[in-house]
């Protein structure tokens, strides 16, 4: 399936947002996710299905000082 992750095209086999995070190597990382412009909390990632052509944003919190 073809999706966009952080404005880059990806061909993935994942069908859920949680599976996508694992497939892209983000498992265990503290990240925030959005699907098609809507925030998806960590508790809903496993049941959030990815449609073909989905727009996914994955961001890591930044620390500053």
Show which residues each predicted segment covers.
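Ubiquitin-like/PB1-type beta-grasp interaction modules and other compact soluble beta-rich domains
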Residues: 1-64
């Amino acid at each position: 399936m073809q999706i966009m992750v952080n404005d880059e095209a990806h061909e993935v086999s994942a069908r859920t947002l949680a599976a996508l995070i694992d497939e892209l190597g983000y498992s265990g990382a503290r990240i925030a996710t959005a699907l098609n412009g809507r925030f998806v909390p960590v508790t809903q990632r496993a049941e959030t299905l990815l449609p073909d052509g989905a727009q996914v944003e994955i961001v890591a919190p930044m620390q500053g000082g």
